[in-house]
Amino acid sequence: VLLGCVLPAGLGQAPARQAALGAGLAQTTRCTTLNKMCGSGMQATILGHDLLRAGSAEVVVAGGMESMSRAPYLLEKARSGYRLGHGALIDSMFLDGLEDAYEPGRLMGTFAEDCAARLGIGRERQDAYAQQSLARARQAQASGAFAGEIVPVEVVTRKETLRLDTDEQPRRADPARIPTLKPAFREGGTVTAANASSISDGAAALLLMRASTAAHEGLTPLATIRGHAAHAGAPGDFPTAPIGAIRTLLERIDWQLGDVDLFEINEAFAVVALAAQDALGLDPERLNVHGGACALGHPIGTSGARILVTLIQALRHRGLRRGVAAICIGGGEATALALELND
């Protein structure tokens, strides 16, 4: 079991191990928790793929999980003692997830602002993209397109048993308010709470095995991983890093852009998807067709796996075959993965 988790403070030892045993897997199951920021869930899938190729595993559960709403506050000097003067509470979500490690205190959204200004992607276009993402997510919910990728969870209370089977974030948003929101990261800026991803909780996982193992177990694989790639650059350039990852991936597996039926590019910010769309010349009708993180949220360690799950189901829903998913990563990196549905 390989599971991404970026905000593990307060979760107890080895969150992936806890998840595996809590799900009823055998105590002999090997487990690893990964932290590659926003790319954790995809990196878990990549490592699972490579373990299978190397013959080091027979079956891998790969994915990610994040409960951003439970990220604790920290008292940095509590162990050694606060001697004199004021102390401060440190938000572990900001410190470990939303702030740049190389310019302490600088939020990821300020780099999205820089990217938007550099590429000339204005507020109106970002807002229009966010509204489109929301509309697509709501349409996918209404049509049942998400049903194949969501495992319902039952929560038992003293009064009733609640069945959770629908993302709540799209229902909370008001598309009419999107153009009226104030900039979130910079006075006079263009990035807002609506055209950026929301803070949310979630988990996603994929079951990986070789085709021979699936046949032996009587299982029919949904898709085959055709390749993966990564890109790294300056930490502040993370919003455009998926462009390099996708280009490297397509060259590596000898696919052309036209060979790809659907793309999923994580909407950490609307400008990330728009930058890739412009640089690669992507058809907007083939990009994030069921909406993205602007509408659904971005649980940090989860999203890399979530977009793979969504991509597979979107391809199935439309009767298509090939897809590419990519995600930007705090620190200046990105990963991309190509898959193809099986006959």
Task: Provide a role label for each language-model segment.
Residues F111-E113, E149, V156, R226-A295:
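Active-site pocket-lining segment
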Residues V1-V60, G64-R83, I150-L164, L257-A279:
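Conserved beta-ketoacyl condensing-enzyme motif
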Residues R125-H216, A279, P284-R286:
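N-terminal extracellular/periplasmic Venus flytrap/periplasmic-binding protein-like
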Residues C5-E58, Y102-M108, R172-S198, A279-R306, ...:
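Conserved catalytic cysteine-centered active-site region
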